[in-house]
C-alpha cells in the first residue's frame, strides 16, 4: 500500500471520527484538511519545484497572518512577506546559498524600523520581524527533507488532532500556563499517534521521531506564547474551524527544524 493510499485512509477514518464526535470544531477542521491534504500531496508529488512553491505559498500566508497578529506596520509586513518565501525557494534553486539568504532576510526586516527612524516602537518591530523570519525559515525543510516530509506532515497532523481530542477526553494536569486547555494526557496520546503514523508509513527514524515527539508540542506552545503576548486567540479567522494557516502549521514548523538539524 502506498503512502498516499494510507494517508487517504487515515483522512477517511478521521472524517468518521470527526462526525462521531459531534463537535463542530473537529468537523470543520477535518473539512479544512480534506481540502488541504490533496493540495499538499499534489505539490510534493511534483518534486522539489512543487515543494518549493508549496512552502513559499505557505510562507506568504504565515507572514501575512503573523504581521496582522503582531500588528506590524504594512511596510514591515511587505518586507517580511517577500523575505520568508525566499528561504524555501533558495533551498530549491541554490541550497548552498541558503545561509546568506537567511542572513539577508534577517537584515532586511531589521532595517525597516531603523530606516523609518522609529524611536518608540522600533525595537518591537525589529524583534517581531526577525522572529518571523526565524520562525518560518524551517519551511525550507519542505524542500530539503525530500520524501520524508510527507511522513512528517502526516505524523505531526495526526499527533496534533489526537492531542487535542485526547486531552479533552482524558483531562488531567495542564501541560503549560502558555496553553492551559492542553493536557499532559493529550501530549502522550498525540505522541503515540504521531510515532505510530511514522511506523505505518515506514518512516520511523530517531530524527523524525524526536521531531514529532518534541517539535510538535513545543511548536504549538511557541505559537501560544506569541498569541498570549499580543492577546489574540487565533492567528487569523479565514480558515473554517481552524483560525489561520499558522494555527495549523505551528507544530510542523519546529518539527521541520528539528528534522533538519538532526539530519532525518
What positions do the PLM features span?
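Juxtamembrane boundary at the C-terminal end of a transmembrane helix
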Residues: 260-264
